[in-house]
């Protein structure tokens, strides 16, 4: 709603921060990587009122308790490898979120990446970097979660999940065909995507997962 304060943790090069700031929201952005900070600053204009700082998602001590209406975690859980760090990240996001505020969590989905990679490499199933018994991907610095693992992580972190979304579905796998679509077909494709993206039976069939939650 108008006047909401948003914290973008792991803001990358600023795509989400800039979008919301230019919609009139009060945005604070925190990013760790030097290259991303530099890219973000290049996009800023004098009209962009964004509090951009360099910092770590595991330490949000610069922000007061219950100071944001919306907290975005659209990157850190792609890269944090051990559960203690993941839970620390979630705990800090909860701490700075107002009671009744919303927290958005993004994950890279483990299970569909196999088909996406197969689209690039016909031999992926024999030579891909994954556990051939459990089908758990190994591609650090990227970290992958199944739908079940993401749910458990958030539940263990005291998050009440409100929405679960297959963010991009098969869009990378089908990118070449999608790029050939007419505007009319693409509009209908998007309608189809939004029709299926929260269906429980299809949640794992995506490269990225999005969860919206609130503090329990």
Can you annotate each of these PLM segments?
Residues 4-10, 104-129:
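Conserved class I S-adenosyl-L-methionine
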Residues 141-158, 164:
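Short alpha-helix
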Residues 163-216:
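A C-terminal cap/extension of S-adenosyl-L-methionine-dependent methyltransferases
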């Amino acid at each position: 709603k108008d006047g909401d304060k948003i914290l973008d943790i792991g803001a990358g090069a600023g795509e989400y921060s800039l979008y919301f700031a230019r919609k009139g929201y009060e945005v604070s952005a925190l990013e760790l990587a030097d290259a991303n900070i530099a890219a973000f600053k290049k996009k800023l204009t004098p009209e962009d009122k964004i509090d951009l700082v360099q910092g770590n998602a595991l330490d949000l001590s610069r922000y007061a308790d219950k100071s944001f209406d919306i907290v975005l975690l659209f990157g850190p859980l792609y890269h944090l490898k051990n559960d203690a760090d993941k839970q620390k990240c979630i705990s800090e996001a909860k701490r700075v979120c107002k009671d009744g505020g919303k927290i958005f969590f993004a994950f890279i989905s483990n299970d569909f990446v196999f088909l996406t990679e197969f689209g690039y490499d016909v031999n992926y199933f024999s030579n891909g970097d994954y556990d051939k018994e459990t089908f758990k991907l190994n591609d650090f610095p990227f970290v992958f979660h199944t739908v079940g693992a993401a749910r458990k992580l958030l539940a263990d972190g005291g998050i009440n999940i409100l929405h679960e979304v297959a963010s991009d579905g098969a869009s990378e796998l089908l990118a070449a065909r999608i790029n050939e679509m007419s505007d009319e077909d693409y509009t209908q494709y998007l309608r189809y995507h939004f029709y299926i993206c929260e269906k429980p039976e299809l949640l794992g069939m995506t490269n990225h997962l999005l969860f919206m939650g609130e503090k329990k």
